């Protein structure tokens, strides 16, 4: 069969190309807008939330570790997410019912490294940078 050729074939070629474009994974991702619908943050880069509980997530094979994470309920829409707590001992700065600032974790909405299903990380606790607490530059505010 092949494609139509000739002087009046442009419309047919154009509409066929438009229809076939939707089979391209990258095109579909860019044009459907599901990136914003599926993302708990909506269109934002960061979101505030309340810590529900501390959880340990087992690392994927071949690693053997328990990665320290927290379950967070976002204030803006009530969605519950799991967020990674970076650096050694930083879980000690976080308590239940704390307000935390959560950011993405790298790979554009995908899990990172050996931590399955965790797409976010903690940036601030009680309006204080987690790194500043970790380095000892700031102390946790007393509530």
From Swiss-Prot:
Gene3D superfamilies reported in the protein's UniProt record: Nucleic acid-binding proteins
Keywords: Cytoplasm, Endoplasmic reticulum, Hydroxylation, Ribonucleoprotein, Ribosomal protein
UniProt-annotated location(s): Cytoplasm, Cytosol; Cytoplasm; Rough endoplasmic reticulum
Stretches the record annotates as Disordered: 1-21
Family matches, as InterPro entries: NA-bd_OB-fold, Ribosomal_uS12, Ribosomal_uS12_euk/arc
Listed SUPFAM superfamilies: Nucleic acid-binding proteins
Residues with PTM Hydroxyproline: 62
Coiled-coil intervals: none
Principal localisation: cytoplasm
Highest taxon in the source lineage: Eukaryota
Any one annotated GO CC term: rough endoplasmic reticulum
UniProt GO MF annotations: structural constituent of ribosome
Biological processes, Gene Ontology terms: cytoplasmic translation
Bias (Basic residues) ranges: 1-19
Family to which this protein belongs: Belongs to the universal ribosomal protein uS12 family.
Complex and partners: Component of the 40S small ribosomal subunit.
Designated name of the protein: Small ribosomal subunit protein uS12
């Amino acid at each position: 069969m092949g494609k139509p050729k000739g002087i009046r074939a442009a419309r047919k070629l154009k509409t066929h190309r438009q229809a076939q474009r939707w089979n391209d994974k990258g095109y579909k991702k860019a044009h459907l807008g599901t990136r914003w619908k599926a993302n708990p943050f909506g269109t934002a880069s960061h979101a505030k939330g309340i810590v529900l509980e501390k959880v340990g997530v087992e690392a994927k094979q071949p690693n053997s570790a328990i990665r320290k994470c927290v379950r967070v309920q976002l204030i803006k829409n009530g969605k519950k997410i799991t967020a990674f707590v970076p650096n050694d001992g930083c879980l000690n700065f976080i308590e239940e019912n704390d307000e935390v600032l959560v950011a993405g974790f790298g790979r554009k909405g995908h899990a990172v490294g050996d931590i399955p299903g965790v797409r976010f990380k903690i940036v601030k606790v009680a309006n204080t940078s987690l790194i500043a607490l970790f380095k000892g530059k700031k102390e946790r505010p007393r509530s």
